[in-house]
Amino acid sequence: MDHSLNSLNNFDFLARSFARMHAEGRPVDILAVTGNMDEEHRTWFCARYAWYCQQMMQARELELEH
């Protein structure tokens, strides 16, 4: 995996953006998003996407409680 800071920041930004779309109820086809990635990038990206989805859902639940 290319561990350059710029590359990781770009992938992280994309994972966060797609997680936000998912949290807003917009359809996200994560297989289409990661289709051209090699296995290492896909694994890293999907882990970050899942983490951001979890964070955004927790934030939404907290908002609904108050």
From Swiss-Prot:
InterPro entries: GlgS, GlgS_sf. One of its GO terms (biological process) is negative regulation of single-species biofilm formation on inanimate substrate. Coiled coil: none annotated. Gene3D superfamilies: Glycogen synthesis protein GlgS. Disruption phenotype: Deletion mutants show increased flagella and fimbriae production, are hypermotile, and exhibit increased biofilm formation. Induction: Expression is dependent on RpoS. Major determinant of cell surface composition. Negatively regulates motility, adhesion and synthesis of biofilm exopolysaccharides. Belongs to the GlgS family. HAMAP family: GlgS (MF_00525). This is Surface composition regulator. It comes from Escherichia coli (strain K12). The lineage of its organism: Bacteria, Pseudomonadati, Pseudomonadota, Gammaproteobacteria, Enterobacterales.
